[in-house]
Amino acid sequence: MSNPPFQRQQPSSPLTTPNHHPSNHQHHASRKPSIVELLSSPPPLPNNTIDDEIHQFSLSRNTSISSRTSSFSQQQHGAPHHGSNSHHLSVSGMDWSEIPLSELTESNKLIYINSSYSVQKAFETLVSNNLTSVPVSISSSNENDLSSCLTFDYSDLNTYLLLIMNKINLSELSVSEIGNEHDSTAKKHEIITQTINKAKRGEEVPIEFIIKLHPKNPFIKFTENDTLFKVMETLGNGVHRVAITNLESTKITGILSQRRLIKYMWENARRFPSLDFYLNSTLQDLKIGSSTPIFIYEDQLLIEALYKMFNERVSSLAVIDRTKSLIGNISIVDVKNVSSSKNSHLLFKSVLTFISYNLSQKGIEEGQDQYPIFHVNKQSSLGRVIAKLVATQSHRLWIVESNTRTHQNSISSPVTIEATLNVSANPSSASSSNANTPEGNFGLPGKLIGVVTLTDILGLFATSKGTKTDPQFARNQRRRSSTSTTRSSIDSAISVGDGSARTTNANADSEIFRKSYTAAAKNESAISKD
């Protein structure tokens, strides 16, 4: 079901939406609105107060200095603000494509690390600062020099873990940056083997080693004077994040990710009339998203899911049952939950078991007992899709073909992961008459038929301004950077029919993993909490 178009003039608060059940008015008035109800249309513009002007464009808790200066300067020169439609004067009358990147620069301290950091210390930096990636200075003379840098993220940690577990063949790695440029391939392989053996013994391994093995897109930089249009084109081609530098390009002043950019576009959507058409159109009308989502079956092992994300160069997989019904999602960030020896046994448990474990941990840490599965259908409006992406801080939403009963009850009874776990654990209770069809799995969102990503949406916005984008460009570039393996070896790695052999290997590999992390006892507590 598509959403009604939002009104640009005098936007109404979702909290005051007319109640469709007058007799239950008191009950519904006290009910806590769902995320989707609150964010199905762009948020209203803030009140025209000086305090609101100060906080106008920042995606963080602090705004850029240039934003504050521009706002105060125009107010001091008598620019109208009370009762005016020009709420944010520094960009009054500007289209989103003309916005300078200085308006999106966070004034928070930029966190970065040096290439000499150990993998474990780099991982702790991600966890302690709640980051998904961190810039890495590769300068040998000045560790604060970020003019040339790479990034460390959870995909690197995943590669590191898979290497320790003997799940990656050397032929699958990019070895061009290892050792000296004149070293033979055999010599480079020898260096890799020696380094991995150090990791297995619990010795520290510098992140410079692992980030060179796991190819990424070049770390693209833009100056604060560049416009949002240029960044939209780059991120719309699948690059996950870019650096923003000062005007002289001598210092990185911030990192702009796809996730932060979509949040900015959503929070400021009412200022940009050119977005109206797209936000009110459905995914089907806009023809965005992929019809070939990458997935893992619920009964496959977690280690297989981690390998598949490595091999496919993706950061998330849909989790489905054998009827292709969507159950949930597994992310590359989830690798942090098995980076402790006490949880290593989960690597050889089913993906469904791991999802259940993640839910229990979130319940303990966040005090929540239910988590919705964030999916959409082809008739969902782009506004609804972006609202869910922003609310969940996700990079993608799964497109499903909803069965009639689930779709009719989706508003009053949103599908939760807990409900799907119950259905998966007790398939006979889902439907005694037709348990082998998606329609029989009442309680599941529906059959997985596609995926829509931040890349798709940002690419759509860039295309609307006349440029061409390829959502698969960056991913294909990452895949070309590594040596491909044969299809047969991949298929054998993710097959499901050899459970007994896998159990034997699991015990041996799990012991290797345990030795690697228990040796670094002083860091165990920091890792175990995640």
Curated annotation (Swiss-Prot):
> What is the scientific name of the source organism?
Scheffersomyces stipitis (strain ATCC 58785 / CBS 6054 / NBRC 10063 / NRRL Y-11545)
Q: Which UniProt keywords apply?
A: CBS domain, Cytoplasm, Nucleus, Repeat
Q: Residue ranges of region Disordered? A: 1-51, 65-89, 467-509
Superkingdom of the source species: Eukaryota
Quote the cellular component terms of the Gene Ontology held in the record: cytoplasm; nucleus
What function does this protein fulfil? Involved in DNA replication and cell separation.
InterPro entries recorded:
AMPK_gamma/SDS23_families (IPR050511), CBS_dom (IPR000644), CBS_dom_sf (IPR046342), Ssd23 (IPR016711)
Principal location listed in the UniProt entry? cytoplasm
Designated name of the protein:
Protein SDS23
Q: Family, per the entry?
A: Belongs to the SDS23 family.
Gene Ontology annotations of biological process type: cellular response to glucose starvation; regulation of mitotic metaphase/anaphase transition
Question: Which spans does this entry mark as compositional bias, Basic residues?
Answer: 22-31
